Amino acid sequence: MVLDELISEFDRGLRSLTGISRMSRPVPVPAQPPAAELTPAERTHAAGLMRVNHVGEVCAQALYQAQKFTARTASAKATFEEAAREEEDHLAWTAHRLKELDSRPSLLNPLWYAGALAIGVAAGTLGDKVSLGFMAETERQVENHLEGHLSELPAADTASRAIVDQMRIDEVKHGKAATDAGGVELPLPARMLMRAASKVMTSTAYYL
């Protein structure tokens, strides 16, 4: 029923913003313990990067909620739901790591969430093929972003690196699922606009 779905998505949104996310998988752990403690500067930098990643997961929840709600076929809804469920793991993992680093989520999370929700609705109104294409492009850009973070994170921060690496693996899977479900490639201007918006978000969330 539509009402039940609305209540469920509202609950998920509240959990995304309040940090009470459920995880279906445990937090990834490094294969080897860190060889050294993080310096204060390394902790600050790692926290900034993980805050950016947490914001990305807040946005992912909003995007996929909106796209699932506006999807026209059961198969598209299932694709968005599966991705959202795994992204909720990412949300919980990054929140957990921020606490370990004695840091906090972005102060602007309600703004990020609202913006992503609006974008998800807009993508959904263009039809399932475009909406799934938007998901595929989002996941490609997130994959590249996470690869960049793996090169930026301090070598000693094996805990954050384990989380980010598993997130990257999941994003690749989500992007492939969206393409396999019928997602079309977005035009270059749309992809460039998405990259520009992402850059604004990441540069702001690192500090705020």
Curated annotation (Swiss-Prot):
Cofactor descriptive note: Binds 2 iron ions per subunit.
Membrane topology, record value: Peripheral membrane protein
Keywords linked to the UniProt accession: Cell membrane, Iron, Membrane, Metal-binding, Monooxygenase, Oxidoreductase, Ubiquinone biosynthesis
UniProt binding sites for Fe cation 1: 57, 87, 90, 171
InterPro entries reported in the protein's UniProt record: COQ7_proteobact (IPR047809), Ferritin-like (IPR012347), Ferritin-like_SF (IPR009078), Ubq_synth_Coq7 (IPR011566)
GO process annotations (BP): ubiquinone biosynthetic process
Pathway per the UniProt entry: Cofactor biosynthesis; ubiquinone biosynthesis
Gene3D superfamilies named in the record: 1.20.1260.10
Cofactor (UniProt): Fe cation
Chief location bin: membrane
Enzyme Commission number: 1.14.99.60
GO molecular function, one term: metal ion binding
Protein localization: Cell membrane
GO cellular component: plasma membrane
Catalysed reactions listed for this entry: a 5-methoxy-2-methyl-3-(all-trans-polyprenyl)benzene-1,4-diol + AH2 + O2 = a 3-demethylubiquinol + A + H2O
Annotated residues for binding of Fe cation 2: 87, 139, 171, 174
Family, as annotated: Belongs to the COQ7 family.
Function: Catalyzes the hydroxylation of 2-nonaprenyl-3-methyl-6-methoxy-1,4-benzoquinol during ubiquinone biosynthesis.
This protein's name: 3-demethoxyubiquinol 3-hydroxylase
Species whose genome carries this gene: Burkholderia vietnamiensis (strain G4 / LMG 22486)
